[in-house]
């Protein structure tokens, strides 16, 4: 997150100031504010896997830039559009100075969510104006034009929002695509937007697993709707939210989501692997960067298939039924029969 998310210990930005002391020159910008562990952890992760690509999004602009002077709700003030674009530039530059390259950003996490802690409302017209007149030009002027911008970053119930942003030609020239969550709506919304603008990418960027759920049911739901569903509807990325939490689903802000289970639960030296871990494990090891989705019939069991750069074929299949199901794989004149246990998912690989 660019600044605090609702899963930070407290709400903050990198340019917090009293309301009566605005900082339009960002003299007090401080990338070390807030989560002290974040930058060292990202550096350690990138040392292990330098090829990892990172995406960043803010939950809120600094309060002094907002109409309500608070980190929850409110909108970006019209006279703060330029300095907020500069805020993104300063963040990207500060992270690069620490060896952390951010490959993509969204202007606002969940821009129609006014209740989260932190949060900020940004309607489609506002986002288009911010991108075309401020954020996009600021990135290019700073030599950061290769950083990809994705609009929206919210639910599948409002495809009209990203479509409105993309319909503005001046905004679209800076866009790489749209980002999506699935706390409302249907995953097929991704296809609607992709069909309207096939030259733009679709990324699925967030879905959390609740602590009040049940492992088996949650795994099947996320596999069907998020991993298989997003890929079948054109997404090139699937991100689960979030990486890790403690047994009490902490940290989170006082008004943030208190039920979000990380992919890993960390309890001292003990690590528990949860739904998001196994969901990603079914695909990440096999579907390597550069893989492409290939056709597969979906009438019997939900599935998605890929062709890897090495020529391997990957098929991820879900059986939500209460009994085992047998299915056939037909490829280049050859057939294999596979039995998948009840309420199970499998990843099949062949060359």
Can you say where each PLM-predicted feature lies in the sequence?
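Aromatic/acidic polysaccharide-binding cleft in carbohydrate-active enzymes
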Residues: 201-279, 295-296
């Amino acid at each position: 997150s660019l600044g605090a998310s609702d899963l930070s210990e407290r709400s903050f930005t990198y340019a917090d100031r009293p309301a009566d002391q605005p900082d339009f020159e960002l003299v007090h910008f401080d990338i070390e504010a807030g989560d002290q562990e974040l930058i060292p952890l990202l550096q350690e992760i990138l040392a292990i896997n330098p090829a990892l690509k990172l995406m960043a999004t803010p939950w809120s602009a600094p309060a002094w830039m907002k109409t309500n002077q608070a980190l929850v709700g409110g909108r970006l003030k019209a006279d703060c559009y330029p300095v907020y674009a500069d805020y993104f530039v300063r963040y990207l530059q500060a992270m690069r100075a620490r060896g952390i390259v951010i490959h993509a950003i969204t202007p606002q996490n969940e821009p129609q969510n006014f209740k989260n802690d932190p949060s900020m409302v940004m309607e489609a017209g506002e986002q288009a104006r911010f991108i075309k007149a401020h954020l996009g030009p600021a990135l290019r002027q700073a030599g950061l034009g290769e950083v990809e911008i994705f609009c929206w970053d919210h639910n599948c119930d409002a495809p009209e929002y990203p479509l409105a942003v993309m319909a503005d030609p001046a905004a679209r020239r800076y866009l790489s695509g749209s980002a999506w969550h699935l706390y409302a709506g249907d995953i097929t919304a991704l296809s609607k937007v992709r069909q309207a603008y096939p030259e733009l990418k679709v990324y699925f960027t967030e879905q959390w697993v609740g602590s009040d759920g049940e492992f088996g049911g949650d795994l099947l739901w996320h596999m069907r709707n998020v991993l298989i569903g997003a890929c079948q509807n054109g997404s090139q990325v699937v991100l689960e939210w979030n990486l890790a939490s403690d047994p009490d689903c902490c940290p989170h802000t006082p008004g943030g989501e208190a039920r979000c289970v990380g992919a890993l639960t960390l309890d001292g030296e003990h690590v528990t692997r949860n739904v998001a871990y196994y969901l990603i494990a079914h695909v990440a090891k096999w579907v390597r960067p550069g893989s492409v989705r290939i056709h597969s019939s979906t009438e019997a069991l939900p599935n998605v298939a890929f062709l890897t750069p090495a020529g391997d074929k990957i098929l991820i299949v879900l059986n939500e039924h209460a009994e085992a199901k047998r299915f056939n794989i037909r490829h280049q004149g050859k057939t294999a029969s596979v039995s998948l246990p009840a309420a199970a998912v499998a990843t099949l690989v062949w060359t």
